[in-house]
């Protein structure tokens, strides 16, 4: 479909009246169920979308939004869609598959989205990914999408990447829940929850990611390469095979690198629990910095580690390692690292790391010089005294928010409460 509405008077395509959402089901060999192409001021809402083939097919998706040789596509809105059972490829290099695929390109006319929104959708049992883009990534010909908002969506039973904006400037990813990820990806595959690629000024906040089981990575959040000024804040990560966050840069990529990432006021409980070897051996650091990332700030995050279920599971709180280079000028400030078992910080050959005022609550090997660091906190001990796992005892840090179709509850970090928590930690 293609349609051109006007600002304030969009073309609306969706259900009306009462009853169940109308269901659109693709033919067996279709790459998409719904295609929105070269449109302006269009809203697609209140529909059920299915694309299940007899066999898996690479690049299969539920809803595809395309802007091609069109210029600027304004205010496309996907709202309250239930997209499910899309059996794409599980392998990224073969094309993968997704619930929603957003594509902007143009041989003759650079084409972008301005004001695209995806909100209140449910994406369930879609393979490989949830919401993913294909946009301009080459910095020499970078035409970013603007005013992108992805808000209050439920992504569940999706094994791969949850939400991945590509080629955007100023994307806002907030109040989304990714959970119940099946461990069905092949051993070669890497994936994580919410992360940008080839983007600037992305804000990822007030989201919750749990149960990620990708064979490699599997963090709740990721500040990826060819990105500048990514902010990951006020998020809740728990029960992921990987840790809270990956911050990475390929040292051989000619793009923008990874500059100015900020990771702050996030809560991680029982992450980094991978019970099997990755393609590089046993590994599941709570914070993983890979490659020559520059000027990263990791500030006031709460990492509450629970006992590992097997002795061979990785116990690294922080690992900074190589990806054709090492990180430089990373600051860790006033974070809480709670560990019930011996753990480790591995900085390897990364340079100019600064640790200032962090809390090392437990036996942590490789602790760096931190003149303002602390080894004990009576306040934190009181917080978790009735529930050492942290799940109930730290629940005061969260609000509950209804998202998706109204049946899912998101735990969103409360901004004021977590600020008070860290001030209390500092003042005791």
Question: Which sequence ranges carry the predicted segments?
Answer:
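Extracellular beta-strand-rich solenoid/capping regions of secreted or surface-exposed proteins
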Residues: 1-12, 23-74, 93-109
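Right-handed parallel beta-helix
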Residues: 10, 14-19, 40-51, 72-87, ...
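Acidic, glycine- and Ser/Thr-rich low-complexity intrinsically disordered tracts
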Residues: 12, 296, 306-308, 322-428
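Short, solvent-exposed loop/turn elements at domain surfaces
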Residues: 21-23, 411
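Short glycine/acidic-rich loop motifs that flank beta-strands on beta-rich extracellular proteins
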Residues: 26-33, 53-61, 87-98, 127-133, ...
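Residue-level marker of regulatory loop/turn positions in helix-turn-helix DNA-binding domains and
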Residues: 36, 70, 92, 110, ...
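Short, recurring structural edge motifs at helix starts
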Residues: 67, 105-108, 138-139, 193, ...
